[in-house]
Regions:
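Canonical alpha-helical transmembrane segments
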Residues: 8-12, 34-35
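Short, small-residue-biased leader/transition segments that mark boundaries at the very start
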Residues: 2-7
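Juxtamembrane boundary at the C-terminal end of a transmembrane helix
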Residues: 226-232
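Hydrophobic, membrane-inserted alpha-helices
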Residues: 25-33
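Transmembrane helix interruption/hinge and helix-loop junction motifs
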Residues: 35-43, 232
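A generic, well-ordered mixed alpha/beta core segment in the N-terminal half of proteins
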Residues: 47-58
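Interhelical loop and helix-boundary elements at the membrane-water interface
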Residues: 10-22, 40-41, 56-220
Length: 232
């Protein structure tokens, strides 16, 4: 159903219909997640399948797709699959399932606080050539909001779930780090959209864009949290 909704969007990205890119990316991401879920597969085989799929799509279109687009799509697809698979790896680590919400909390909180801080206090542009509406004040507000939400998460875990795996001090630093990473992820996907001259990655969420528009920061934050929690 999601693919059908994506196919409705026929605008082009770099000369390639978005539905074609979404089709390749969806399959590639699914295969990547499948590899991480089933350790019997080998990464080299998965990469080869993704590359072959990308080239097959290019050949089918009679050379309309450039080699650089194939490589960008392939790399992006593997990154998306690997990032989302962080949730599977986190769950497999035995950590409390409540922590699976943390990548979303430390991404959406930063985005929300940054929006309102920028709306009320924003004066100095953060990256005008990439995202003209983002401001330094908004960025600082997002980081502060992330720290507050991270501390609130620790309090909730201590109060209702028998204790937190991470203390208040380390969580403050972790939330600050994730806030920076979330903003880098947001700007990175904004840069890609500007590069290809598109406004949104899809229409799944109507006016709010597609999956990547809503979860761009999560893709960057989830692997960071996975790495941090692997040392706990």
């Amino acid at each position: 159903r999601q693919r059908q909704m994506c196919i409705r969007d026929r605008r082009c990205v770099g000369g390639v219909k978005r539905s074609e890119l979404v089709s390749v990316s969806t399959v590639a991401a699914a295969v990547t997640v499948g590899w991480i879920y089933d350790r019997d597969h080998h990464l080299s085989v998965i990469i080869m399948l993704v590359v072959l799929l990308a080239f097959f799509s290019a050949i089918e279109k009679g050379g309309e797709v450039k080699f650089s687009q194939i490589m960008a799509g392939t790399g992006g697809s593997l990154f998306i699959g690997w990032s989302f698979a962080s949730f599977l790896r986190l769950e497999a680590s035995g950590i409390h399932r409540a922590y699976l919400l943390l990548p979303f909390i430390l991404s959406f909180a930063c985005d929300t606080f940054a929006f309102f801080a920028g709306l009320t206090l924003g004066k100095h542009k953060l990256a005008p050539k990439v995202s003209p509406k983002k401001t330094i004040e908004g960025s600082a507000g997002g980081l502060l909001g992330n720290v507050l939400c991270g501390l609130l998460f620790v309090w909730v875990m201590d109060r209702f779930f028998g204790g937190s795996a991470i203390g208040y001090g380390p969580m403050a630093l972790l939330a600050l780090l994730c806030g920076v990473v979330a903003q880098v992820g947001d700007l990175s996907f904004s840069l890609i959209k500007r590069e290809f001259g598109i406004k949104d990655y899809g229409r799944l969420f109507l006016a709010h864009g597609g999956v990547l528009d809503r979860f761009d920061s999560v893709l960057f934050v989830a692997p960071v949290l996975e790495i941090i929690f692997s040392f706990l």
